[in-house]
Amino acid sequence: MDAVILDIGQSIAAAIRDNPPGATFILNSGVHREGLLWPKDGQTFIGAPGAVLSGARVLEGWQREGAVWRRPGLPRPHPPGYGLLTAGRESGRHLEELFIDGVRLTRVDAQSDLGPGRWYFDANDGAALIAQDPTGRSVELSVLGVAFSGPARNLTIQDLTVEKFATPAQIGAIHGHEGIGWRILDCIVRWNHGQGINVGPGALVSGGAVIENGQLGIGGGGANGARIEGVDVARNNAAGYDPYWEAGGIKISASAAVIIARNHVHHNAGPGIWGDIDMIGTLYEANRVEENDLNGIMHEISQDAVIRCNVLVRNGRVGRDWLLPSQVLIQNSRNVQVERNYVEVGAGSGNGIVLIQEERGSGARGPRETRDNLVRGNIVVHRDAGGWNGFGTVADASAADLWPNRWEANIYYVPDEGPVHWMFGGVPRHWDELQGRKAFGGTVVQGERRLVGTTPAVKPPC
């Protein structure tokens, strides 16, 4: 059948209802203000150039009251969302966002805190208040909770901008958690309160950008076989969620055979890429991960991963606290290969390639222990006298000597020969102490050290 053309104002939900599985819909240029869409199996949604699917409504009818402008009569707000927020960002529990000319304002909890770039919701009469003149400007309030959701199989969303949905934390504006085989191709997903995209089993997110979402760029759990490839994932966690809880660029959990490759993951307020809780058979390959607040790539309480041919630069912008954050962090995980990556530790920011063991109980494959890992053929550059590489333990320092983790053929560039850039078993070590160190008959540390003046080009040795 021919594609169904949808102009502005036509109901997308009605078109889904009135057409069979496998139908194709083309959303014409302009802003389609609709959401809560449950497609049928195999349906395809393609955006014409300039097509936007928005969860926001336009606010007109502002009334000036002294130094502020009030817009009464707003719909009942969503219940406050869940999730941990950082201190001072508690207003992020509210799901609605207000935008002026496409710029997100910060919500405050008291009218007295109003000022440029801020807005307040007065629950007494359901009014939004701002401290800047809205005359001649586009003011929008996000009201709809999700764009696409449901159990459809083999859905395709392509060339579409999806923005300004009032999603809670851990829910994507494109929420494919219950679906199978969703394909999200060359889409821009931005300015949503929770996650931009949540993937399910067999999903493919390819191309496009997932930017400036409130909690997380791309998330998912139970997303076996999902692929995230060639996506710009940037400046997420705009609402101020606690990144140690869950916030930042990409986080996938409890999934097998996930591939995260060739993405540019940068300037997120949290980790760049995070695999957590029984991630098995994960491939992190050829990503450029830079200037995220916490760890660059983190594989936590999981097994069987390959981290190769990535560029990781100046992650850990919040500073350093022991071995956290790091460019690459292997936390209570086993059988991980960290190979042929370019790693750069910025001045005052983060660490290099780090393994950590602490008591984390058992998972799908037994005790969660940091063992049987290989760190080989990486280039690690330190821009100052700080930052660590190696193996840190909490409570049981003997694990560093007893468990078979190996470091082979890595090259470390350091500012001078004096600083100590290694930790082993929770104890700082000088380079000379580590050469040829043995465990279970294998060489634990083997490589070379060069001065930073001979730093190579910023590319992985692949």
State where each predicted segment sits.
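Detector for repetitive beta-architecture
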Residues: 22-24, 29, 42, 50, ...
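Generic serine detector
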Residues: 11, 29, 54, 91, ...
